[in-house]
């Protein structure tokens, strides 16, 4: 007998093991009506009819269970039909998020959409959106797919409407708000339950109960024999097992309360995304939480195409954490690494120093060095890492050593240049080493009296086959050399032919190296002839040239070079060039060979020298300071393409340093290739240790034929070791590490490939991973076991033992000294307090001053206050207001010393005449500016209203010992003056810009990775690209400077006690030098002044200049001004006209779309509420999903939600908590650390409501109230001009804050402008950044036009270069507002106009340099009326 559809449903429920989870009515009445099967696509679609909706949690459980059950057979989907759709609207709200996830929207847009409210009306679902832009975007993007998703869940929906919130929908919203409130109450209950659960778990742990999950294990054990490499996964499969290390993990909570985990793993063959839903009534979540980046897992599941990321992913059924054998250093006695590069080696090293230090400590190494290229920026982190891991840190650097003066002439002869005979010669060889390679061609010409008088050209037989590289370079073949004479014969003949002539060669050190080596092997000894190097000569006398190669010089001197890299042709070209150079030397007064070096030497000689790598190791604290001086000089004084260290500089500051020979680019390695052993040993004596590096690192030298073969390389090692033994200098094996493990090398390849001019940008890079002792011993096994142990282990440890403990960073603050600072700050504070509050100060004022002064003076901070006071005073004296940032406004002393305008005392009245005051200490008033107007009961004068109620603790900490960070907003145009004033206060050598280090950002790294893969023709899935991006992210790319940070060095120390110095981004033309260390590294050691540039003070200054109104006299509580934050009525326009419900376009802090929406939601009416808005808009998780919902559901209003960090401390103290606990809670919440059990208990004991606790738990970051108050004060002042002096406001706004103009639209009528704005709103999601900036300007222009003002076209006669000017009821734009017209051209137009009128467009082009495109734009704008294309001459002009 066939089963009924109900029986089929029961069987299905049993099979997928959810019968016990379903409601009885559903289980008994549910029907499985049919299954649509597609064998081709391997899909099954179950059609199910239910009597009522499944609870959302049960629905997700059902879907997940059925997918898991049949995952090995088919991809399963379900379509539900619900016969009784009662409460469809209620269920729609709960299913909304799931249905959104079924669409193809981006994660960001999905997140935005999930925040929206729903209203069900029959078969129509309304989604309430914020504005027309959202409505149009969502309607186009997801309407159809969202309807389909709802219908698949069983909803009877005909239409989805995206609708903006209008007043007639309020009654529909009421029921929804009740529902949300119910959910909020439920959330509060869940939070309480969660707390109780935490308590219980903590108690269990204290009882040593080890039941907590510390290792992930979900599903069945996975058989290791089933594991396959990730790179082998190329298509959908039913059951696959892999293992890999986690490099990214994301655990997301769904609305149902369940979670989904997304893990990215790699086995270093490739990478893959793994996904899994938590199962109901299982402890999957705890298992997932046990996972973290760096752990290895084994996973099994179905490989399927993820439609969203468009890539293969694994839907896991099983996952288990595994222990993976890590790389070990098994040697009994460990080595010490003396040469490694971190992420601070610009675009070359990969890991941060902390990773190296941890690895060295794990391997048991006793010490480790850091030697980045040319910089020491890893030192601060190195110190911290070494302290953490208990390992000795050795500080060093790999620098670029140059000889101070590279000679142009060698072996000076007393010979008059014009009378001398010269032999200009060139050699072609089998390679670059005169010790290991051979001459194959020697060609020369003899020159006398400016003419070539003889030639010499010979091949020589090397008795070995030429490499393909040499054949291609020289065009000499083996056949050409078969019958050639021996080199001994050629050189003997050549020596006789040369006689006593002066040798001339281009890059003479190379050619003479082969000649001298050949002479010595023949027993002649080195040549005694004079030499001139045309390469160095050109670099000296042709400083304007950027190149000095033979090809380039031949073109410059007009000399024909027919076949470069054939000796005779190169020689003849060099000869003709040299003849002209002799004339140049004569003009420079150089007449004799022995005068060349003396008369042509200059202070830039270091630029001509070829740099050799050198390793500098700090031996003691004195050496550290000397290294700082060397680094600074190399970056500031001797920078040429790269930082350079003249040998004289190293000699001057060598004390406390150990000097090593570095790598194959070092002077000693080059000498082994180019000089005999006696010369090598002589050079070796300059160094304190000799480095040899693994043969694997030199394999590319063999590949590039710079070293003949492995046997030659081994001989080079032996010569280096012999040089060390002979000179008594230790020889150590160093790894030249650039990354940790072999598999990290790909990241370095990608970074190098991103630099086209980098000499390392070759097809292969050597393996430069951090090697264990075993690996290093194995690399040098060819030396024999004893010798290998000596250089790898014994010598490195002995060298490390010679190095003292060095501390690169100070452990305390060193502030400048200013005589009498303590007394001056105290006197200034009380003097200004008495001016404001009277001679008989209120006790609250005295108490606050004394409390702050005790901390400020007691901790040595008075000088910091005094410096800030001087800077502010100078700016005020020069006519520019200064705005404060950060929490300095929390300090009443800062207020009384006029550092900030924010008064942090509780709200109060003050009589300006008789000085009586009245304070409100009960928290009933948020801001003194919100107090009602009142007259003095004693004298009748209008009272001053002040006080923002901000505790001092938010500035200097509860104990008052936190170093003050005083941030000041100066006018952008005045900022350079403020910076330079610090030089007046402290001296030029005591102030520096705070340095920053710019690293490779994720987006940039993504471009590098994609570019590399494309160039290599490699395809990788997204997860592997993400891994490679992570590998490249964070590597140093450049340096910079803090926008306003000034570092002040105390007069009793110098900058090298703290950090080296440099120019930002190595820009030698920069006006300021910066700290070499990132300023965060020395933040607690030296004073940093934040002298920032800001538009608001500049705008205030322009408004003051235009109006004559002192901004300090502007009333903060002007009713019409306050009105614009909730309606545009006081501007004389309607919401429809300006397309906005507020009047805050262009008002700082309140003009963005995000904040305008906040204003619409909250409708603030007081200053304190505006401060709340400012705090809410700058915080993280303070408004969205937090205060916004509390206000919408009526739980509290704007004034009572948590807006700024200080609100928490003040609120809790008023609630009865001890100030210390209130402070602790505030600090914990503002840093996103939530609340501890103790904090929650204390708050509940003092009857703090649950919603307040819940709000605290959600917050990730909070804005200081003093910062918000200062910003709002500036905003209200600017808003005052907008309301009462509109043209002054619009002229100032367009001049100071706007940058992208569409003048064609701006000069039109108000209807046209409004239509343009409306059209741009409809296309907002598709607009680029520039268009959005233009839209911001047009919004202001539309408002201005609807207020009755208009914009004129550019006027050749009246327009200024940079400022908008007022004419009647109009503004005239400046030339700079023309798109594509730069500052210099704008100035030039005004200058040219002052010399006389423009006669034609041609005249305009000639005098002002305007392009044809700009002239056409001005013509279209109507700015060139009656201006002819060309001037017409009249008879009277002739």
From Swiss-Prot:
Function: Required for replicative DNA synthesis. This DNA polymerase also exhibits 3' to 5' exonuclease activity.
Name by which UniProt lists this protein: DNA polymerase III PolC-type
GO MF annotation list: 3'-5' exonuclease activity; DNA binding; DNA-directed DNA polymerase activity
Native organism: Staphylococcus aureus (strain Mu3 / ATCC 700698)
Record-listed E.C. numbers: 2.7.7.7
Top-level taxonomy: Bacteria, Bacillati, Bacillota, Bacilli, Bacillales
Protein location: Cytoplasm
Chemical reaction(s) catalysed: DNA(n) + a 2'-deoxyribonucleoside 5'-triphosphate = DNA(n+1) + diphosphate
Lineage top rank: taxon: Bacteria
């Amino acid at each position: 007998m066939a089963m009924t559809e109900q029986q089929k449903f029961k069987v299905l429920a049993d099979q997928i093991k959810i019968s016990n989870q379903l409601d009885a009515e559903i289980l008994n009445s549910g029907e499985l009506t049919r299954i649509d099967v597609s064998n081709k696509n391997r899909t099954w679609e179950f059609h199910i009819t239910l009597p009522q909706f499944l609870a959302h949690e049960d629905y997700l459980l059902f879907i997940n269970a059925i997918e898991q059950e049949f995952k090995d057979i088919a991809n399963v989907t379900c379509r539900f039909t619900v016969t009784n759709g009662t409460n469809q609207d209620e269920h729609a709200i709960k299913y909304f998020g799931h249905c959104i996830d079924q669409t193809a929207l981006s994660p960001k847009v999905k997140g935005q959409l999930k925040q929206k409210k729903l209203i069900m009306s029959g078969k129509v679902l309304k989604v309430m959106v914020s504005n027309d832009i959202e409505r149009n975007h969502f309607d186009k993007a997801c309407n159809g797919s969202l309807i389909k998703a709802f219908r698949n869940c069983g909803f009877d929906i005909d239409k989805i409407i995206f609708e903006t919130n209008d007043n007639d929908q309020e009654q529909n919203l009421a029921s929804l708000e009740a529902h949300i409130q119910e959910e909020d109450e439920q959330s509060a209950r869940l939070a309480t339950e969660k707390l109780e659960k935490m308590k219980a778990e903590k108690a269990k742990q204290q009882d040593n109960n080890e039941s907590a999950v510390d290792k992930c294990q979900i599903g069945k054990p996975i058989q290791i024999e089933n594991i396959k490499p990730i790179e082998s996964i190329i298509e959908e499969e039913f059951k696959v097992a892999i293992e890999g290390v986690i490099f990214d993990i994301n655990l997301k909570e769904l609305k149902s309360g369940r979670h989904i985990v997304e893990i990215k793993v790699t086995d270093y063959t490739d990478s893959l995304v793994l996904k899994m839903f938590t199962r109901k009534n299982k402890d999957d979540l705890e298992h997932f939480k046990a996972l973290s980046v760096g752990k290895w897992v084994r996973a099994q599941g179905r490989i399927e195409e993820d439609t969203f990321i468009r890539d293969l992913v694994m839907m896991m059924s099983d996952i288990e954490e595994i222990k993976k054998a890590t790389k070990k250093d098994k040697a009994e006695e460990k080595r010490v690494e003396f040469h490694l590069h971190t992420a601070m080696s610009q675009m070359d090293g990969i890991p941060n120093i902390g990773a190296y230090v941890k690895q060295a400590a794990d391997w048991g190494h006793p010490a480790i060095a850091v030697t980045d290229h040319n910089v020491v920026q890893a030192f601060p982190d190195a110190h911290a890492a070494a302290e953490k891991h208990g390992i000795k840190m050795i500080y060093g650097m790999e620098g670029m050593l140059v000889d101070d003066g590279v000679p142009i002439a060698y072996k000076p002869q007393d010979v008059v240049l014009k009378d001398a005979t010269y032999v200009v010669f060139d050699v072609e060889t089998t390679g670059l080493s005169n010790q290991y390679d051979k001459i194959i061609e020697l060609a020369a010409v003899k020159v006398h009296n400016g003419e070539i008088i003889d030639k010499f050209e010979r091949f020589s037989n090397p008795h070995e086959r030429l490499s393909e590289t040499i054949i291609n370079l020289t065009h000499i073949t083996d056949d050409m050399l078969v019958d050639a004479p021996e080199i001994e014969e050629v050189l003997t003949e050549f020596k006789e032919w040369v006689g006593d002539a002066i040798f001339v060669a281009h890059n003479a050190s190379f050619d003479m190296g082969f000649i001298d080596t050949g002479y010595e092997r023949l027993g002649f000894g080195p040549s005694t002839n004079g030499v001139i190097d045309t390469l160095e000569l050109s670099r000296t006398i042709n400083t304007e040239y950027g190149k000095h190669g033979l090809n380039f010089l031949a073109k410059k001197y007009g000399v024909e070079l027919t076949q470069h890299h054939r000796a005779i042709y190169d020689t003849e070209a060099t000869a003709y060039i040299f003849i002209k150079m002799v004339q140049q030397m004569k003009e420079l007064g150089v007449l004799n060979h022995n005068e060349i070096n003396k008369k042509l030497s200059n202070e830039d000689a270091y630029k001509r020298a070829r740099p050799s790598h050198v390793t500098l190791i700090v031996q003691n604290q004195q050496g550290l300071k000397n290294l700082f001086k060397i680094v600074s000089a190399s970056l500031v004084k001797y920078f040429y393409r790269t930082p350079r260290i003249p040998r004289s500089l190293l000699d001057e500051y060598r004390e406390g340093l150990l000097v090593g020979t570095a790598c194959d680019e070092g002077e000693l390695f080059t000498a082994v290739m180019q000089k005999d052993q006696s010369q090598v040993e002589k050079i070796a004596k300059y160094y304190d240790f000799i480095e040899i590096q693994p043969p694997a690192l030199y394999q590319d030298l063999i590949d590039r034929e710079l070293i003949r073969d492995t046997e030659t390389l081994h001989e080079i090692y032996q010569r280096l070791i012999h040089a060390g033994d002979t000179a008594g200098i230790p020889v150590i094996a160093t790894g030249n590490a650039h990354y940790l493990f072999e598999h990290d090398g790909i990241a370095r390849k990608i970074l190098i490939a991103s630099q086209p001019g980098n000499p390392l940008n070759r097809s292969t890079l050597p393996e430069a991973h951090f090697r264990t002792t075993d690996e290093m011993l194995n690399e040098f096994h060819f030396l024999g076991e004893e010798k290998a142990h000596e250089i790898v282990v014994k010598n490195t440890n002995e060298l490390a033992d010679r190095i003292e403990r060095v501390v690169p960073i100070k452990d305390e603050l060193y502030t400048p000294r200013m005589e009498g600072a303590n007394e001056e700050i105290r006197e200034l504070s009380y003097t200004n307090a008495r001016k404001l509050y009277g001679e008989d100060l209120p006790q609250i004022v005295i108490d606050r001053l004394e409390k702050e002064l005790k901390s400020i003076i007691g901790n040595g901070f008075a000088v910091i206050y005094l410096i800030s006071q001087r800077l502010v005073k100078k700016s005020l004296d020069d006519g520019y207001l200064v705005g404060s940032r950060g929490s300095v406004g929390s300090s009443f002393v800062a207020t009384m010393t006029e550092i900030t305008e924010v008064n942090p005392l509780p709200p109060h009245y003050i009589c300006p005449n008789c000085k009586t005051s009245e304070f409100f200490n009960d928290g009933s008033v948020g801001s003194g500016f919100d107090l009602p107007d009142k007259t003095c009961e004693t004298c009748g004068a209008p009272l001053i209203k002040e006080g923002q109620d901000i505790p001092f603790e938010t500035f200097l900490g509860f104990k008052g010992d936190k170093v003050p960070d005083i941030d000041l907003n100066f006018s952008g145009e005045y900022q350079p003056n403020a910076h330079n004033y610090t030089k007046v206060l402290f001296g030029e050598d005591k102030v520096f810009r705070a340095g920053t280090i710019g690293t490779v950002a994720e987006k940039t790294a993504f471009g590098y990775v994609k570019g590399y893969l494309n160039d290599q023709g490699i395809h990788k899935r997204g997860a592997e690209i993400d891994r490679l991006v992570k590998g490249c992210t964070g590597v140093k790319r450049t340096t910079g400077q803090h926008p306003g940070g000034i570092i002040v060095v105390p007069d009793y120390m110098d900058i090298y006690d703290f950090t080296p110095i440099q120019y930002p981004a190595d820009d030698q033309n920069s006006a300021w030098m910066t700290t070499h260390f990132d300023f965060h590294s020395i933040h607690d050691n030296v004073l940093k002044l934040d002298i920032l540039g800001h538009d608001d003070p500049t705008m205030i200054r322009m408004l003051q200049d235009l109006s004559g109104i002192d901004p300090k006299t502007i009333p903060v509580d002007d009713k019409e001004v306050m009105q614009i934050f909730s309606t545009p009525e006081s501007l004389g326009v309607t919401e429809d006209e300006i397309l906005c419900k507020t009047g805050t376009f262009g008002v700082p802090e309140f003009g963005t779309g995000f904040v305008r929406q906040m204003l619409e939601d909250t409708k603030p009416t007081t200053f304190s509420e505006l401060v709340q808005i400012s705090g809410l808009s700058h915080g993280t998780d303070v408004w969205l999903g937090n205060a916004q919902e509390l206000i919408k559901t009526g739980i509290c209003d704007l004034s009572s939600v948590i807006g700024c960090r200080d609100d928490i401390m003040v609120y809790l103290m008023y609630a009865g908590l001890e100030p210390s606990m209130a402070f602790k809670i505030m600090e914990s919440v503002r840093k996103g650390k939530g609340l501890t059990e103790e904090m929650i208990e204390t708050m509940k004991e003092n009857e703090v409501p649950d919603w307040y606790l819940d709000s605290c738990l959600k917050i990730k970051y909070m804005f200081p109230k003093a910062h918000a108050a200062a910003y709002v004060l500036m905003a209200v002042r600017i808003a005052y001009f907008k309301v009462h002096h509109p043209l002054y406001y619009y002229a100032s706004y367009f001049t100071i804050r706007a940058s992208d103009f569409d003048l064609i639209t701006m000069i039109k009528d108000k209807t046209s402008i409004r239509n343009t704005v409306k059209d741009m709103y409809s296309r907002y999601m598709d607009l680029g950044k520039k268009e959005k900036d233009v839209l911001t300007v047009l919004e202001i222009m539309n408002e201005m036009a609807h207020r009755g003002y208009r914009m004129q076209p550019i006027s050749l006669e009246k327009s200024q270069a940079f400022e908008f000017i007022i004419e009647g009821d109009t503004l005239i734009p400046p030339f700079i507002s023309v798109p594509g017209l730069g500052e210099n051209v704008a100035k030039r137009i005004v200058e040219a106009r002052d010399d006389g009128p423009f006669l034609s467009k041609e005249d305009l082009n000639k005098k002002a340099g305007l392009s044809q495109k700009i002239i056409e734009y001005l013509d279209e704008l109507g700015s060139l009326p009656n201006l002819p294309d060309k001037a017409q001459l009249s008879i009277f002009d002739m």
